[in-house]
Amino acid sequence: LSQPVNLSVTGPFKISSDNINFSNNVQVSSGSSEIFIKFSPTQTGLIVGEILLESPGAESVEVTLTGTGITVVHSYTAFNQQPLGFGGGFNQSASQVFSLHGDMSNIDKVKMFLQIDCPSSGCDDWDRFANVKVKDPASGNWFEIGRYITPYWVGTQQLDRGLEFDVTDFKSYLTGEVELRIYIENWTAKADIVTVEFDFVEGTPDYPYYAVSEVLGYHINSIDGVPYGVDHNFDLDKNIQIPNNTESAHLRTIISGWGHATPNDIGGRPCAEWCFRTHNVKINGSSMFQHYMGPIGCASNPINNQNPGNWQPDRAGWCPGMVVPVRSNDLDLSSTGSSFNFEYDFEDWVSDGAGGNAYYATSTYIVVKSSSQISSPIVTD
């Protein structure tokens, strides 16, 4: 060749003659023998591109390029083999400050994994209420980012990394120096040995800015929840004001029932562990969302080594050895406006006073997102 060579590339590839400046097109002299290629995929899996080489007086040449896009994940260990129990020098909770991922601009998802190992004495015999919280630096309050029920007798080793939670909603709190708290309502000296890890998954976030405020915070333990079937003074009505630059908003609720209050439902199902119910979320006085507290498939739990524990029968919205589901409800901003009234309305039922009390441990958060920096919603009684 006596003429310069023009190169052009397709797909998520860039080319350069100096390994510094990369673009879709480059021209090199006829004597050049080295070209640099940069692969910047925007999706996972096998990706194909092409380089076209052209020079006056010569036939063009096409070179196929292939690359495999993989997801970039930044992993951090928070609590590491932290024992939680009661008596024998153990505590039911532990809190600590950890350094988590700093730059959240290209983080699409945040996953949390929780593994329970057993001490030499074996794990706790019972299924226990348990959760993970992050401290809100502004208020000092603890926000519940995940709840689960421990398995009977065993840990979570049937799962490679234990229980998995999507905590992306709280990513504005899970960056830099973060204070976390773990809790298990374990009343024995058979301590649960807990490890918590976070995966920060790279990708294009739906919105660059998130903010969160707590609406209902009855999540200290299984019987700190809202009493069910009796009169109570728990405040379930709130006013929520969201920032004017909110582009997306949703409610995030975790709810689980406890207790064996009567009268039993058909089939001998007492409340609130076993009784199937449908609760309503009201916006400005109208029922907008329903939370069905029904079966979620306890018998199909992959942590299936919980015998002789009573793990297979379906509870109302939770299972031993499983994550308590998050109930996410998108808000229609065109109808709610920037200020609206919220009410959590439990299905009507009256306890007869026998069988003990019934409780619903309940947490609800308002999550707002925007393309510009956004402040937290204001929640008032």
Predicted feature residues:
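A composition-driven signal for long, intrinsically disordered, charge-rich low-complexity tracts
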Residues: P12-S16, M112, D381
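Extracellular/secretory-pathway and virion-surface proteins
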Residues: T68-T380
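Feature for long, exposed domains in two main contexts
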Residues: L1-T71
